[in-house]
């Protein structure tokens, strides 16, 4: 949606059509997440995930202020609960400093107690530029603005084939009634989320050889009893693991509290939360949120991340690639856009515009 809004502004007079197989925007990864505005702490400074996040953070706050998109700059605490995590936290701090993250600082256990009296950490890392956003209202803004400039939102429309032609691409689509038709376009932007590898494959790219294969990774959330509302005022994270940032205290704009997400690789797309995970969530979260009791947690929601690597494989960056060198001029692939995809939506849109 951010790409459509950007191009509707910079390429006025060109016909832009958004093809979406669901009956509205944001039915998958874009809405099923923690809705966090990240600051760019974790990853190496030369990665797209870092550079786009560092630039995207202030841009997104500015858009929210200007356009009235609900958000809150809560700040974020990453907590170390043992000595080994303290060493790991030092590494995150040093990386964040290299990345140029504004206001980042190490905090002591006493400072943690002052900032978040119901949380526990031997020490921590405080990021004042992290926050939360209403992702639905953000996407609604993108939709409304793009449509006001003439963009067509073709909901209930699934891409079933994509073929290079002399002048661009022939895109075969199917609607909810099963009717099929073909569109011709000079440019195709593949931002299909969990299905981006399938679109790339349709275009003739060997997704396994080129590293475009997506491995769905499920993240589940458990809600916290309303009796604890107000006990957490910031995003509170554990020191992260190797494949994700860790199940953390997720705040909503109305101050409801959730714990999540975990990270479970799956073969099928299902958004059902496994109730048997309650004890694991509880045992992990209670290390840094000691006020929790097992009965405080209830299954809430789940999302699926489009990861580019399997469990145990090396970390992979976003793929944002114009495919002219493969003989596919005018095709831009956005593959593996997981966290911090929400924070980087504006800078990803800028990058796509630049590539075109």
What are these regions (language model features)?
Residues 44-55, 79-88, 126-144, 154, ...:
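Short beta-strand to alpha-helix junction loop
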Residues 125-187, 198, 346:
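Helical element adjacent to the flavin cofactor pocket in flavoenzyme catalytic cores
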Residues 42, 130-132, 240-244, 332-344:
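Glycine-rich phosphate/pyrophosphate-binding beta-alpha loops
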Residues 5-6, 37, 69-71, 182-187, ...:
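Active-site substrate-recognition segment that forms the wall
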Residues 35-111, 121, 246-247:
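Dinucleotide-binding Rossmann-like beta1-alpha1 core, especially the glycine-rich loop
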């Amino acid at each position: 949606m951010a790409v459509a809004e950007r191009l509707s502004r910079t390429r006025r007079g060109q016909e832009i059509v958004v093809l979406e197989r669901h009956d509205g925007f944001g039915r998958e990864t874009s809405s099923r997440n923690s809705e966090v505005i990240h600051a760019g702490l974790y990853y190496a400074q030369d990665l797209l995930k870092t550079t786009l996040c560092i630039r995207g953070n202030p841009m997104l706050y500015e858009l929210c202020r200007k356009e009235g998109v609900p958000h809150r700059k809560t700040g974020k605490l990453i907590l170390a609960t043992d000595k080994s995590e303290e060493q790991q936290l030092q590494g995150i701090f040093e990386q964040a400093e290299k990345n140029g993250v504004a206001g980042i600082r190490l905090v002591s256990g006493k400072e943690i107690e002052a900032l978040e009296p119901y949380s526990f950490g031997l020490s921590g890392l405080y990021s004042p530029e992290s926050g939360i956003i209403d992702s639905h209202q953000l996407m609604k803004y993108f939709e409304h603005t793009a449509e006001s400039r003439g963009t067509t939102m073709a909901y209930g429309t699934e891409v079933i084939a994509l073929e290079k032609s002399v002048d661009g691409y022939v895109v075969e689509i199917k609607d909810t009634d099963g009717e099929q038709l073909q569109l011709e376009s000079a440019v195709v932007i593949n931002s299909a989320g969990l299905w981006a590898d399938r679109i790339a494959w349709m275009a003739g790219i060997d997704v396994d050889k080129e590293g475009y294969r997506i491995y769905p990774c499920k993240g589940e959330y458990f809600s916290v009893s309303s009796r604890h509302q107000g006990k957490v005022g910031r995003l509170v994270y554990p020191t992260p693991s190797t494949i994700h940032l860790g199940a953390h205290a997720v705040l909503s704009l109305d101050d409801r509290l959730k714990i999540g997400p975990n990270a479970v690789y799956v073969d099928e797309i299902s958004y059902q939360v496994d109730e048997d995970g309650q004890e694991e969530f509880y045992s992990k979260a209670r290390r840094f949120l000691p006020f929790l009791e097992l009965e405080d947690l209830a299954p809430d929601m789940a999302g699926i991340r489009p990861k580019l690597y399997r469990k145990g494989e090396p970390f992979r960056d976003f793929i944002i690639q114009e495919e002219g060198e493969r003989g596919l001029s005018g095709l831009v692939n956005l593959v593996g856009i997981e966290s911090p995809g929400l924070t980087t939506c504006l800078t990803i849109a800028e990058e796509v515009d630049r590539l075109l």
